[in-house]
Amino acid sequence: MRIGIAGLNGLYWPIAMGNGLAGKPGVQFLAAATLGEDETEIKDNLGLSPAEYAAKYKIKLYDQAGDMVRNEQLDTVVLVTRHSQHADWVERLAKLGVNIFIPKTFVTTPEDAVRIVQAEKQYGIRVAVGPSARFLPPMAAVKRALEAGLIGAPFSLRVCHHHGTIDVFKQNDWYRDPKEGGPELSLGWYGIDLALHLMGDKVKMVFAKYGNYTSPGSPFMDCGRIVMEMEQGGAASFDMYFCNRINYPAWQLEIVGPKGVISIHRAGENATKTVVSLDGAAGYKELPLPEKTPHWEMFWVDEFVQGRELSVTAEYARQVTLISLAARDSARTGRVVALSS
């Protein structure tokens, strides 16, 4: 796979993707394009100038994505731009015949989601989206236990995710622009994906409550809860913590079925250590983690390289986005929002 990155103006994804791609078997990480954005702004947000980034990964630097794709004969591009520009860039890049990976937030409107799905079909490319917490070892252990029937068909799920705070983003970072979706979409992505994946069901209705309790400089919520009624009658909830300036477990979970409860919970004083456990008729026991799982941010690479079915498609991302937007609408209006089937 011959791959490049389109866009360097971001705090996290250019480095995360660069580290994940560099030296990976079957992958040639060849270039990055600034998309004509101001170099000073890129360095302010990324912490590296475009030239420093190119030197770090020993890649070529371009201004325009089209030149990068053509000159380097790329077959795949990672898109790192403002979320509100994703659809525009997918339509441009799809015409060049490259596959595309879009780090969340996928899009900020239903219309943009449709545009990406249509571009993928029109030009015969593949669009993958991520990351997905389903590939984290504890979540993979939960899924394995569900598939083994250890608790029967689940009917209730509670997920809690602690994601730090907005403090890491500078005041002039475009992430703070409400037009780009904020944590309502970027964090909602994780929990909704897990609800669909672990419950094996679709969402019927959504109710959400968001608030800003500890982040006076932020235009967004910093703590929220999404409650989802599933089509088959079960329920799932997702607590988003973007407010804790303390050490706290990144992930906690309970999923309930007729034969027991599977949980991810804190183990001891170490705030980062959690265990996966089963409470059933035989009592309590810890469940082992899988020896190996796909990387939760880079799983799509092998899927592209090996031509496998994509775990997180553009159409699936469209559905997750619709649920995220419905939750945001619910939080703003105080009403339950029904999802169209």
Regions from the PLM with identified roles:
Residues 26, 76-79, 303-341:
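C-terminal helix-rich "cap/oligomerization" subdomain common to oxidoreductases
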Residues 9, 133-218, 334:
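Predominantly a Rossmann-like dinucleotide-binding segment in NAD(P)-dependent oxidoreductases
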Residues 1-53:
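N-terminal Rossmann-like dinucleotide-binding module
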Residues 75-76, 82-83, 87-134, 149:
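Beta-strand-loop-alpha-helix segment that lines the small-molecule cofactor/substrate pocket
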Residues 186, 192-269, 297-309:
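Contiguous beta-strand/loop segments that form the cofactor/metal-binding neighborhood of enzyme cores
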Residues 60-70:
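Short acidic low-complexity segments
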Residues 63, 102, 127-129, 238, ...:
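Hydrophobic residues in well-ordered beta-strands that form the structural core
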